[in-house]
């Protein structure tokens, strides 16, 4: 849209989306789940499976998972390379320590041990470097969220120190072949 000589981009307009008791800001230039009811169930499931006081949210997007811990006495690290997503993440999850970087590059330079790592990679899945870093950091639990069962299966097979203990599918797009899968991974004993 144009207003006089100045371009007025719809992409920069934010909308507030309430999921459960959390208010998120999103825009048309970023991804946000459209099925709020099932998203709320998935977020509750993720939150109830987090362990410890320190959490890393890799591929954090607009802070969907980081925002679960607003106001709690936890240390949250959010890593996202997309600038617009990170701007919204800082608003949605103000208590998270946010980093604008590629997850593998950030992990090599600044990664650290945390209790739980939440990963929600794009459809292409995790970089092998990220899997290696996760095993190096040795978190107590990894929560892997995937929208692509093929890359999720591939990624899970590449872990040598972790194994899935529980897998739950959320049909966020009823009537289509697209689902979100949450895999809980624990260290092998």
Outline where the language-model segments fall.
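Rossmann-like S-adenosyl-L-methionine
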Residues: 1-189
């Amino acid at each position: 849209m144009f207003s006089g000589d100045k371009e007025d981009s719809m992409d920069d307009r934010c909308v507030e989306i309430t999921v459960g008791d959390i208010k998120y800001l999103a825009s048309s230039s970023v991804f946000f789940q459209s099925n709020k009811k099932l998203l709320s169930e998935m977020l509750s499931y993720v939150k109830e499976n987090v362990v410890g006081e320190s959490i890393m949210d890799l591929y954090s997007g607009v802070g969907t998972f980081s925002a679960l811990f607003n106001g709690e006495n936890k240390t949250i690290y959010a890593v996202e390379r997309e600038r617009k997503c990170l701007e919204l993440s800082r608003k949605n999850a103000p208590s998270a320590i946010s980093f604008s970087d590629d997850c593998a590059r950030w992990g090599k330079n600044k990664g650290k041990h945390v209790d739980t790592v939440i990963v929600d990679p794009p459809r292409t899945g995790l970089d092998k470097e990220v899997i290696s870093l996760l095993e190096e950091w040795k978190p107590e639990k990894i929560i892997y969220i995937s929208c692509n069962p093929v890359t999720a299966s591939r990624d899970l097979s590449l872990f040598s120190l972790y194994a899935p203990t529980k897998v739950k599918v959320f049909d966020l797009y009823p009537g289509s072949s697209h689902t979100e899968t949450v895999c809980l991974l624990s260290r092998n004993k």
